[in-house]
Swiss-Prot record:
GO cellular component: plasma membrane; protein-containing complex
Post-translational modifications: Phosphorylated on tyrosine residues in response to RBP4 binding. Phosphorylation requires the presence of LRAT, suggesting it may be triggered by the uptake of retinol that is then metabolized within the cell to retinoids that function as signaling molecules.
Keywords: Cell membrane, Disease variant, Glycoprotein, Membrane, Microphthalmia, Phosphoprotein, Receptor, Retinol-binding, Transmembrane, Transmembrane helix, Transport, Vitamin A
Gene name as annotated: STRA6
Membrane topology: Multi-pass membrane protein
Native source organism of the sequence: Homo sapiens
Subunit structure of this chain's protein: Homodimer. Interacts with JAK2 and STAT5. Interacts (via extracellular domains) with RBP4. Interacts (via cytoplasmic domains) with RBP1.
Sites carrying sugar chains: N8
Protein name (record): Receptor for retinol uptake STRA6
Length: 667
């Protein structure tokens, strides 16, 4: 009995070699965890993101305070000599000649930051510095209401970056250069240290931040260029000297417009000319003498950024998963399919190849649907820009808005101001939702086409659609014959032409055929109703992001919130920034500056050296002014003619009642 336990005993030196932990050779040593294959480990930058954002937020507040010292509000504080500090405006939305690239870049940066915020756990990154770690050692990220505060945080973070461009001061350009380079340096440093992240896709954060880096890179170059120009005296006295340049160009182009009708009609009509006309009506091309408002430029920029961000999210969120599933298919999939009663083949290896091929086809259908959705959305955007220009030109000429009679007043209203404020945001949201709906519809359509028609025809198996058509061909043939025979009878039997006018004939046969074919027409009507639902769904999905088009009937067009917002947006734009009205105000200021005065010129008037430049507003190439006063008189005389001919919507209340009825509805 003593020999048995003695046989199980081992020497002390052999105890470590046959320990319990050494039996599992796949276990990591030292308590380390195995990293799953293909999974990206979490990356942490050398400096916490919270510290980055804390420094950027402090710098932004400092820049905003300095800008407030530069921008003096004399109108609000007339008793103060130099004025009181005021909050600078980030963007002058209703100005016609302010730089448009800077607001577009800032809005692109803001939207890209919001897109990166959605999958991020840290809604307010700098709060993680003060957050207490949880029991497992990880810092608890703020969620819930902090996400809402994060939306306001990023808007306030980039507020000074946009306000530096509207201040019109050399110090503002210096502050903008510093702030833009700080933002760009932080973003580049973070992407360089952690190019791969485990969220959604390893390169999603890097790809989604490309518009962000592009916008910050542009701002980091634009502000230094403006700073150098201000030091070299290449710019004028700021934005005040540029306020009437677009209005002057618009009015000059309107009054000096040449007759192009003869050359247009004498041109040869062919395929190239027809294609050119179609492209002109479908794709926006700039035209001299007309600029789109800044709000529309921002909407186009935000729409392009939204298309990129949504398409990227749809691509990296689905395609890598399909590829992983296709790479992990083994022979066990045959047993899984057999459990559902699906037997593709007796050979298991052939089943694996078939499943991989079907997954590859599914991936192709998904990518094709995504490409088609992006192309259609982009074409709808370009078509909308053409419609915007057409509507604005018609409203500048005095056309009436096709809203209800209660909303046709030219004066701004509470609803109109709210719609104007939310127009660009609505446009971005509509484009995002429209692209998502189009992706779902096109993916289902391409998948059905591939798996029910193309692949069965190519491989000669799984002919489910063709077998169903084979079994139900009498039904479809009856419906087709009913439709064909009714159309033939309507053309040859029930319609007769007398003296060039078609008339009904054989009415008894017509009544009998209508009664007898009623059951078949009910079935045909069911098919037509299904087709109508599919067609209307496809049409509305494609035009969901087009706010200038109502998705409801004309009588209920005002119930469409997107269309209603667009029409009120046009009302504010035309009533507050009409180029002809701006040119008229510029002429009044220029004429006032020419009058002999003993007191100094006010701040809002032009300088004495700029009156000659303003007199060139309405002068043609043939007549040039020799002096300032004759030019001013001719300018005022020609403005009287232009003012008489132009119908300014802001002055509708001063028109005659007969002229109000002459304005046609806006198409």
């Amino acid at each position: 009995m003593s020999s048995q336990p003695a046989g199980n005993q081992t020497s002390p030196g052999a105890t470590e070699d046959y320990s319990y932990g050494s039996w599992y050779i796949d276990e990591p040593q030292g308590g380390e965890e195995l990293q799953p294959e293909g999974e990206v480990p979490s990356c942490h930058t050398s400096i916490p993101p919270g510290l980055y954002h804390a420094c950027l937020a402090s710098l932004s507040i400092l820049v905003l305070l300095l800008l407030a010292m530069l921008v003096r509000r004399r109108q609000l504080w007339p008793d103060c000599v130099r004025g009181r500090p005021g909050l600078p405006s980030p963007v002058d939305f209703l100005a016609g000649d302010r730089p448009r690239a800077v607001p577009a870049a800032v809005f692109m940066v803001l939207l890209s930051s919001l897109c990166l915020l959605l999958p991020d756990e840290d809604a307010l990154p700098f709060l993680t510095l003060a957050s207490a770690p949880s029991q497992d050692g990880k810092t608890e990220a703020p969620r819930g209401a902090w996400k809402i505060l994060g939306l306001f945080y990023y808007a306030a973070l980039y507020y000074p970056l946009a306000a530096c461009a509207t201040a019109g001061h050399t110090a503002a350009h210096l502050l903008g250069s510093t702030l833009s380079w700080a933002h760009l340096g932080v973003q580049v440093w973070q992407r360089a240290e952690c190019p791969q992240v485990p969220k959604i896709y390893k390169y999603y954060s890097l790809l989604a931040s490309l518009p962000l880096l592009l916008g910050l890179g542009f701002l980091s170059l634009w502000y230094p260029v403006q700073l150098v120009r201000s030091f070299s005296r290449r710019t004028g006295a700021g934005s005040k000297g540029l306020q009437s340049s677009y209005s002057e160009e618009y009015l000059r182009n309107l009054l000096c417009r040449k007759k192009l009708g003869s050359s247009y009609h004498t041109s040869k009509h062919g395929f190239l000319s027809w294609a050119r006309v179609c492209l002109r009506h479908c794709i926006y091309t700039p035209q001299p003498g007309f600029h789109l408002p800044l709000k529309l430029v921002l909407s186009a920029t935000l729409t392009g950024t939204a298309i990129y961000q949504v398409a990227l999210l749809l691509l990296v969120g689905v395609v890598p998963t399909i590829q992983k599933v296709r790479a992990g298919v083994t022979t066990d999939v045959s047993y899984l399919l057999a459990g559902f009663g699906i037997v593709l083949s007796e050979d298991k290896q052939e089943v694996v190849e078939l499943v991989k091929h079907h997954l590859w086809a599914l991936e192709v259908c998904y990518i094709s649907a995504l490409v088609l959705s992006c192309l259609l959305t982009f074409l709808v955007l370009m078509r909308s820009l053409v419609t915007h220009r057409t509507n604005l030109r018609a409203l500048h000429r005095g056309a009436a808005l096709d809203l209800s009679p209660l909303h046709r007043s030219p004066h701004p209203s509470r609803q109109a101001i709210f719609c104007w404020m939310s127009f660009s945001a609505y446009q971005t949201a509509f484009i995002c939702l429209g692209l998502l709906v189009q992706q779902i519809i096109f993916f289902l359509g391409t998948t059905a086409l591939a798996f029910l028609v193309l692949m069965p025809v190519l491989h000669g198996r799984n002919l489910l659609l063709f077998r169903s058509l084979e079994s139900s061909w009498p039904f479809w043939l009856t419906l087709a014959l009913a439709v064909i025979l009714q159309n033939m009878a309507a053309h040859w039997v029930f319609l007769e032409t007398h003296d060039g006018h078609p008339q009904l004939t054989n009415r008894r046969v017509l009544y009998a055929a209508t009664f007898l074919l009623f059951p078949l027409n009910v079935l045909v009507g069911a098919m037509v109703a299904t087709w109508r639902v599919l067609l209307s769904a496809l049409y509305n999905a494609i035009h969901l992001g087009q706010m200038d088009l109502s998705l409801l009937p004309p009588r209920a067009a005002t119930l469409d919130p997107g269309y209603y917002t667009y029409r009120n947006f046009l009302k504010i734009e035309v009533s507050q920034s009409h180029p002809a009205m701006t040119a008229f105000c510029s002429l009044l200021l220029q004429a006032q500056s020419l009058l002999p005065r003993t007191m100094a010129a006010p701040q809002d008037s032009l300088r004495p050296g700029e009156e000659d430049e303003g007199m060139q507003l309405l002068q043609t190439k043939d007549s040039m002014a020799k002096g300032a006063r004759p030019g001013a008189s001719r300018g005022r005389a020609r403005w009287g003619l232009a003012y008489t001919l132009l119908h300014n919507p802001t002055l509708q209340v001063f028109r005659k009642t007969a002229l109000l009825g002459a304005n046609g509805a806006q198409p």
